[in-house]
Structure formats: C-alpha cells, structure tokens
C-alpha cells in the first residue's frame, strides 16, 4: 500500500506471533511489547538526520555523527501507546514526549478526546505518533488532527497491527503522514476489532477487561 511500510524483520514477526497467542500472560505481553517497540523504532527512525560533533576519544580528537534527539517527539495515544513508548525511549532517551488521551466509544466507534499535552514547539519537531492498533483509524486521525492544529507538520505514525479499513481511512485523512506497522491483518469484525489481531492491546498489557 502506498505510504505504508510493513516492518517484516524476523525478530519483529517472531515476537508478534507470541503476543498474538491467547495464552501469553500479561507480564510476557508487556515485556514483548517493549522489546518489539525497540525494533520498530529502529526502522521508523532509520533516516533521521545527524549532525557532526567534535569529541575526544581516549586517543585523539575527531568529528563524529550524533543525533539531535531534542528535535524528536514521541506522541503516545493513551493508554496502550505507552507500551510502545517505553522501548522507544530506551533508544532515544533525549526525545520529548507527548500524551494524547483518545478512546474509542464502543457503541459509535468514534474517538472521544479527554487529554492533550505536547511540547509548545511541535512545529519545529519530527513527531512519531504511537498506538499499537490501527483499527478504524478514528483515534489516530483525531490525535494527528490535534497535533496539526498546534502546528505540527512533520509526522509519522507507528503501530503494531493495522486493518486495511483503518489504513484507508487514515490515508484519506492524512495522506502526508507515512504509516509504519509490523502487520496488515485481514479485516475488522462487527465490533471494530482487528482480525485475527491480538485482542485489546491495552487490556492485555494492563490485565484489565
């Protein structure tokens, strides 16, 4: 699909299979989500710009490339997005963090916003929005709408699973935002869940129903 990158690294696919299993425990699911987020982050940040810095090694002075982490924002769609956030911050601890509170009304399947906090200068930063599931796309669309209202324009979206319906809706709303995912699954069921999916990522991560 145009504008969509499927991250098919063997380690990503292996860990995703274990996460899909219904017998995988809450603790294991949480650990695997953190591990897989590190691998996904590696791919979504592959083309980040580096600057040169003069450093001293134990032997001599040299010019060496370094990442400008302060120009990067990880935006987590609460609450499940936080599961991806932790592993990504392990890789880029200097990145800024945004939290966007959006939940899906299970009757209407429409997003309900309840919280938004982001750096004031989002217009000057690369924003990587994270949410494990791109189902209908409504929550992620609403989150990115909010970021764009604040001036953000350099945005990427990272998820673990995506449904074709969600991708179509998302790309129609935000054709300028590339999508990175570990898998494009078959379809949405009548309740708006990704099939075959892995269940509700937030519930499985936190042990709630």
Swiss-Prot record:
The keyword GTP-binding applies. It comes from the Bacteria. Its cofactor is Mg(2+). Transmembrane segments: none annotated. Pfam families: UPRTase. Gene3D superfamilies: 3.40.50.2020. GO terms for biological process: UMP salvage; uracil salvage. This is Uracil phosphoribosyltransferase. It comes from Rhizobium johnstonii (strain DSM 114642 / LMG 32736 / 3841).
């Amino acid at each position: 699909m145009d504008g969509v990158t499927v991250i098919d690294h063997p380690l990503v696919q292996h860990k995703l299979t274990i996460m899909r299993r219904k017998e995988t425990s809450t603790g294991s699911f949480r650990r695997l989500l953190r591990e897989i987020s590190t691998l996904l982050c590696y791919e979504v940040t592959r083309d980040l710009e580096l600057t040169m810095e003069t450093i001293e090694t134990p032997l001599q002075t040299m010019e060496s490339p370094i990442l400008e982490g302060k120009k990067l924002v990880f935006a987590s769609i609460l609450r499940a997005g936080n599961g991806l956030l932790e592993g990504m911050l392990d890789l880029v601890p200097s990145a800024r963090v945004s939290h966007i509170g959006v939940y899906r009304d299970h009757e209407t399947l429409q997003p309900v916003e309840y919280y938004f906090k982001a750096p004031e200068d989002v217009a000057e930063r690369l924003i990587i929005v994270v949410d494990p599931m791109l189902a209908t796309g409504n929550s992620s669309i609403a989150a990115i709408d909010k970021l764009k209202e604040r001036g953000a324009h350099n945005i990427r979206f990272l998820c673990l699973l995506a449904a074709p319906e969600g991708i179509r809706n998302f790309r129609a709303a935000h054709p300028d935002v590339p999508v990175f995912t570990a898998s494009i699954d078959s379809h949405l069921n009548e309740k708006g869940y990704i099939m075959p999916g892995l269940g509700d990522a937030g519930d499985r991560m936190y042990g709630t129903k």
